[in-house]
Amino acid sequence: MRTVLVTGSADGIGRHAAAQLIAGGHRVIVHARNEDRAADAKAALPGAAGVAVGDLSSLAGTTALAGSLRAYGRLDAVVHNAGIARLDSSERELTGDGLESMFQVNVLAPYLLTALLPQPGRLVFVSSAMAAGGAVDLADLQFDRRPWNGFTAYSTTKLLDLMLAVAIARRWPSTLSNALDPGWVRTKMGGDTAPADPEDAARAEVRLATGTGPGVQVTGRYFTDRDWQPDGTVLDPALLEALLAHCADLTGVQLPGDEQGGPAA
């Protein structure tokens, strides 16, 4: 039995993943952004070990979420499933922290949560095939100066999620840290015409979080059914370290060194 946190598990792929983990006998903590959605998650997933509430569009909310999660002890796995998309937006949307909303929820929140929690055994960052269309500029990650394009901005956050997974895999060799493209899935975000079943997408998350065998006991990988893989440019170690430093500057929290002191297992 593993203790697993699935963020954004009030509905969509996250709820399916949490349900599958519970059915598999695991101790599962589900997450919702507010109390109303937490009540929905609790009703839908009565076998969950707990429901954690925290608004990932707020630095204070994410920090408080990490504090509440410490009551569960060291987590075996964290699935960073929560995310938002504003593909057709005509202009940037800022959070209360003055940060671009997709960047804060999709990238900065999983970084901050990871940095604040005791180092887990596994990390799963949910990326997207749209990462292939991302355009990383560390001097302008939030599109302050570049012309705004919601599609490109979202794609960039998904590429940054992939980069975070690899960067943390390098920093924490005793944690299995990987990124996953779940496909175009029939959810509120993906729409009713999407071809992929959320149950199948959830199984991919569960496999990376709890599976055994050489296929999943790896680290620093991007799992996808598509042909595209990131090239060495975006996975350059110096760029990855610069991304971690940028996230640390924005949050005021450094990602600590490897607490386990050994190779991933």
List each model region and its residues.
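Conserved glycine-rich Rossmann-like NAD(P)H-binding loop of the short-chain dehydrogenase/reductase
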Residues: G24-D40
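C-terminal helical subdomain
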Residues: A179, A194-A245, D249, V253-P256, ...
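Catalytic loop of short-chain dehydrogenase/reductase
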Residues: G83-L94, L99-E100, R122-S174, D181-A194
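A glycine-rich helix->loop->beta "capping" turn
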Residues: P46-A48, S68-H80, R86-R92
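Canonical Rossmann dinucleotide-binding motif of NAD(H)/NADP(H)-dependent dehydrogenases/reductases
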Residues: M1-I29
